[in-house]
């Protein structure tokens, strides 16, 4: 006896992650999803980029999509409650919530939301992200927003954590100049290209982080058609800003700090200028293995 399993269309295969067409972020807002290997500095990058957009006069919303809910603490200077925790308190009757229950104002007016997630080993993080966007729309909190940044958990590219790609205009990939980070970046490129067939998301570019040099990133970019949009060296002030629970824009303006601030402002300006989307071509695993490293 044989049976045939049909390949599900994008967004199908899980009731939890199929996007409700009514839960779209309004046209006009610049929506960016930030991905990268776990621990590479996505939250630091997202928060400082949000701060940079706000410095340019934009109304910014940052949505943390990690159960650790630590995406926005450098903006708010505290750990804020998550959407999933707040919804549980009202037995998921969202009509009982006020915006101040789950949205918090951070540095320079950046609005912050932590979607949170289900307990480890249960549920779907993508479902939580979808519910967060739905809640924001129900309360009309996206209507006057210029920029939305999704800070996404690790390099997981399953249907659930690929959910922010369904809302985004661009994806930025944060990487270091090492094999593991670039290997993860390649998987993310594959996921974005798959989503781009049915959604508006496109590759915006690469953010080189915690790296003095970019030679390995450059090799990968040259082979795949990607482009480095910003380069943040391993500056100790960035590490200290996390310990101080603040953005790089709140640090003492030393030469290193000002250089980092200007790089974030430049990245924000470039993204606002309708950056040319990239048509990246992911490599096979063996190709990356052979490409990277030294002769």
Curated annotation (Swiss-Prot):
Give the UniProt keywords, A-Z. Answer: 4Fe-4S, ATP-binding, Chlorophyll biosynthesis, Iron, Iron-sulfur, Magnesium, Metal-binding, Nucleotide-binding, Oxidoreductase, Photosynthesis
The UniProt record gives the binding positions of ATP as 39-44, 68, 209-210
Q: Does the keyword Metal-binding apply?
A: yes
| EC main group | oxidoreductase
One Gene Ontology molecular-function label = oxidoreductase activity, acting on iron-sulfur proteins as donors
Q: Where does [4Fe-4S] cluster bind?
A: 124, 158
- Name the needed cofactors: [4Fe-4S] cluster
Q: Cross-referenced CDD domains, in alphabetical order?
A: Bchl-like
Per the entry, the cofactor note is: Binds 1 [4Fe-4S] cluster per dimer.
Q: Where does Mg(2+) bind?
A: 43
In short, the EC number is: 1.3.7.7
> Which GO BP terms, alphabetically?
light-independent chlorophyll biosynthetic process; photosynthesis, dark reaction
The cross-references to Gene3D superfamilies, in alphabetical order and at most eight, read:
P-loop containing nucleotide triphosphate hydrolases
Pathway given in the UniProt record? Porphyrin-containing compound metabolism; chlorophyll biosynthesis (light-independent)
Describe its function. Answer: Component of the dark-operative protochlorophyllide reductase (DPOR) that uses Mg-ATP and reduced ferredoxin to reduce ring D of protochlorophyllide (Pchlide) to form chlorophyllide a (Chlide). This reaction is light-independent. The L component serves as a unique electron donor to the NB-component of the complex, and binds Mg-ATP.
Q: Which family does it belong to?
A: Belongs to the NifH/BchL/ChlL family.
What the entry lists under PANTHER family is as follows: LIGHT-INDEPENDENT PROTOCHLOROPHYLLIDE REDUCTASE IRON-SULFUR ATP-BINDING PROTEIN
The record's subunit annotation is:
Homodimer. Protochlorophyllide reductase is composed of three subunits; ChlL, ChlN and ChlB.
Q: What is this protein called?
A: Light-independent protochlorophyllide reductase iron-sulfur ATP-binding protein
Q: Which organism is it from?
A: Prochlorococcus marinus subsp. pastoris (strain CCMP1986 / NIES-2087 / MED4)
């Amino acid at each position: 006896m044989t049976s045939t399993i049909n390949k599900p269309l994008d967004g199908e295969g899980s009731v939890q992650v199929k996007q409700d067409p009514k839960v779209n972020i309004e046209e006009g807002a610049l929506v960016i999803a930030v991905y990268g290997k776990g621990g590479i500095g996505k939250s630091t990058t997202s928060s400082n980029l949000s701060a940079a957009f706000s410095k340019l006069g934009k109304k910014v919303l940052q949505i943390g999509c990690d159960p650790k809910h630590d995406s926005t603490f450098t903006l708010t200077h505290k750990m804020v409650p998550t959407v999933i925790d707040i919804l549980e308190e009202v037995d998921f009757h969202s009509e009982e919530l006020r915006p101040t229950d789950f949205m918090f104002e951070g540095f320079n007016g950046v609005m912050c939301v932590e979607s949170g997630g289900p307990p480890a080993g249960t549920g779907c993080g993508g479902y939580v992200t979808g519910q967060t966007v739905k809640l924001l729309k129900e309360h009309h909190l996206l209507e006057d927003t210029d920029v939305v940044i999704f800070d996404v958990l690790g390099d997981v590219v399953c249907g659930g954590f690929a959910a922010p790609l369904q809302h985004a205009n661009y994806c930025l990939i944060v990487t270091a100049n090492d094999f593991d980070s670039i290997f993860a970046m390649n998987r993310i490129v594959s996921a974005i290209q798959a989503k781009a067939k049915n959604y508006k998301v496109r590759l915006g570019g690469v953010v080189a982080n915690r790296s003095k040099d970019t030679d390995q990133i450059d090799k990968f970019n040259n082979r795949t058609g990607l482009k480095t949009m910003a380069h943040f060296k391993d500056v100790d002030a960035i590490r200290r800003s996390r310990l101080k629970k603040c953005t790089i824009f709140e640090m003492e303006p030393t030469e290193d700090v000002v250089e980092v601030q200007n790089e974030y402002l430049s990245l924000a300006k470039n993204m606002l200028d309708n950056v040319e989307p990239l048509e990246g071509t992911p490599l096979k695993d063996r190709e990356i293995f052979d490409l990277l490293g030294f002769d």
